[in-house]
Amino acid sequence: MTEQKYIVALDQGTTSSRAVVLDHDANIVSVSQREFTQIYPQAGWVEHDPMEIYATQSSTLVEALGKKGIRSDQVAAIGITNQRETTIVWNKETGKPVYNAIVWQCRRTADICEDLKARGLESYIRENTGLVLDPYFSGTKVKWILDNVEGAREDAEAGKLLFGTVDTWLVWKMTQGRVHVTDYTNASRTMLFNINDLCWDSKLLEEMGIPASMMPEVKRSSEIYGQTNIGGKGGTRIPISGIAGDQQAALYGQMCVEAGQAKNTYGTGCFLLMNTGQEKVTSRNGLLTTLACGPKGEPAYALEGAVFMGGASIQWLRDELKLISDAHDSEYFATKVDTSNGVYVVPAFTGLGAPYWDAYARGTIVGLTRGVNSNHIIRATLEGIAYQTRDVLDAMQADSGIKLSALRVDGGAVANNFLMQFQSDVLDTEVHRPKVTEVTALGAAYLAGLAVGYWNSIDELQGKAEIDRSFLPHQDEEKRSRRYKGWKRAVKCAQTWSELRDLED
């Protein structure tokens, strides 16, 4: 029998699909990545092509194995981690999506949310799903598809349509339509799942007109869901045995499996999660109560704050403003000036997330004077990411009653030393960057490996979280407080736009 030497993590993100191959020591052996098309039909709308998502993800799996000559019979299991909330509805008979995937960033369902609020469902949603009533989550996206795609509602009521977040879609495709499943972490992001009873909420399905037959089966984040023979040379069937939404996978990859441990992922958005164990903490400060993974992949509760625009605001500097040619250049230009020269950039391009939850706020640059140059704007954009993180962390500490001694960080933007140092200064907290920053993939791999006995216990994994660098705060309290007050004023300017939305075309 061939020794199964590897675990593969499929990391399906907002802008790219990746496959990461790891060995038993959790070393990364091979990586493949492919970007895919971002579709913007109109202002505030964001879509992906589900078939392109699957095509890019499956090709990266083949490429990652092929780079190192790894056969499929050498792979013990596959774990999946994915962009959350992004919504796909497809016909189970044809296997084809009825519409593009509606991405988590998309704000088209703001009016549906207003209608649900007017019908008195806001507090019910908060109490039973742990979420706030916002276009961010999947439920209103499903309703929009059923209401706006010709024939969709009729087919749904006839039992022909299936709903899934991206993990569900990938597993369904990889098992040739045999398995329609999700895990607790992804289900908890739909605004359709009752986190008290751990089941789909029949009242919310009824209120949004979504047939229960569309919903996937919900399972733990670490168990065998099905098998696939996609990729690889030998055609051996490989177990798919780990699923977690990207942020919960990162939390697990950072080994934040006990109550009170927290991390921030700096990706397209920024996501701060704190594991609260078996205690459901209801936020008083605009945070989400959601589901994460306990030590064995069982559901545990967590607090989460989401910042919609993190790394995406650096992309904006590159792609729209043309101030930099590469995202890595932002650190160089930000350090060419000592301060932002009084400038604040609030990147509310698709509204504001936690703790504000203002769907109508818009991006704002304040404090401009004749002496402001491009370096100041670049620096202020990076500082805006750190300020938004403080907004969330302050709320999280108030809700949980826990003062963090350190924040664990991951994601692409943590390579930016200026951002990490400024983050530490703004928080007055140590920031720890791990040696292996691919913690989202690590989390998916750990969950998959534990399910098939590739790793025997959580204790075996605990020692793998080595720190690359710790950033210590250097800013004095007076300066920290003064600058943060300026940020709060800038946020109010961004929110003022919501009062003027009747002036938009």
From Swiss-Prot:
> What GO cellular component is one of the record's annotations?
cytosol
Species, as recorded? Vibrio vulnificus (strain YJ016)
Q: Which domain of life is it from?
A: Bacteria
Q: Which cysteines are joined by disulfide bonds?
A: none
**Residues annotated to bind glycerol:** R84, E85, Y136, D246, Q247
Annotated ADP binding sites: T14, R18, T268, G311, G412, N416
Protein known as? Glycerol kinase
Can you tell me which family this protein belongs to? Belongs to the FGGY kinase family.
Q: Which reaction does it catalyse?
A: glycerol + ATP = sn-glycerol 3-phosphate + ADP + H(+)
For this protein's source organism, the top of the classification is: Bacteria, Pseudomonadati, Pseudomonadota, Gammaproteobacteria, Vibrionales
Described by its record, this protein's role is as follows: Key enzyme in the regulation of glycerol uptake and metabolism. Catalyzes the phosphorylation of glycerol to yield sn-glycerol 3-phosphate.
Please give the InterPro entries that the UniProt record associates with this protein.
Answer: ATPase_NBD (IPR043129), Carb_kinase_FGGY (IPR000577), Carb_kinase_FGGY_CS (IPR018483), FGGY_C (IPR018485), FGGY_N (IPR018484), Glycerol_kin (IPR005999)
